[in-house]
């Protein structure tokens, strides 16, 4: 659980850089919440190259510049994660060019994903406002009610590190249930 941290540089919660494609860094089943990058990028996570982020909850983080939830350089994989209620100047949820699969990207301050390349790959993910890619779902800005919504158990009311205590598990009836890609 990485929470309530701040950095005067990059990576408010964590700054991670893998070595190469044969020695990837892994962040697995972690909560990265309520962190702040005060002058640079990556409020929750700053990912250099060759990092896998799997099964994580990245919520209520803030960056002054790029990537409120995640700033991703190159050759990064984000799989089975919730990226929710983050804020920044550019790319409130994700900024960069990662490969994103089976994620819920919702409720971030303005832009859910700010891609820095035309080769960005987002697939089998539920994204507020939609995102072009195979198997993606266009989520409503509302958590419940009319439209296609994520139906989180208890989301925070606001975005950024001033809000905490959300329960980001999805309930029965969520538009995201059984919509991801199964491996194997």
Predicted regions mapped to residue ranges:
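Extracellular calcium-associated, cysteine-rich motifs in secreted modular proteins
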Residues: 181-184
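Predominantly extracellular beta-rich ligand-binding scaffolds that present long acidic/polar faces
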Residues: 1-173, 177
